[in-house]
A protein has these predicted regions:
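Positively charged n-region of N-terminal signal peptides that target proteins for export
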Residues: 1-4
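Hydrophobic alpha-helical targeting segments used for export or membrane insertion
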Residues: 12-23
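Extracytoplasmic soluble-region selector
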Residues: 21-126
């Protein structure tokens, strides 16, 4: 039974590698955070370890009200995809750079579990 599970895990790892090389979105998770580029702040992210998930895409969509008012608020979307199984913490910091200083206005830590089949599960948000 252990041998079969080991072989299955190896096959899944190979398939995930092929999927990643081809850029096919299969096992992804999305994070949506409020952002106001007019304020000078933007979201930055970092992983506590590499090789578990990677950024697949990010884009910003302004709110309809902010377009009309010119205040610039909207939503920043981050889509991550699985690379390998394991646990990973993604830290998001809402930062602004001014006068050689890095100012962090807000931060969140998302903890994910990626299973042996590439499924991504959000475990917690701090």
């Amino acid at each position: 039974m252990t041998l079969i599970f080991g072989l299955l895990k190896a096959v899944v790892s190979i398939l995930l590698a092929i999927i990643n090389i081809l850029g096919i979105q299969i096992n992804t998770t999305k994070v949506e955070l409020y952002e106001n580029p007019a304020s000078g702040y933007k979201w930055e992210y970092s992983f506590d370890q590499s090789g578990i998930i990677t950024l697949n895409e990010t884009h910003y969509t302004p709110d309809t009200d902010s377009i009309l008012s010119g205040k610039g608020g909207g939503t920043r979307y981050f889509t991550f995809r699985a690379l390998d199984s394991g646990n990973v913490r993604v830290t998001f910091e809402y930062v602004k750079y001014t006068d050689n200083q890095r100012i962090v206005a807000s931060d969140y830590i998302y903890t994910y579990i990626v299973d042996d089949f590439g499924g991504i599960t959000l475990q917690s948000i701090e």
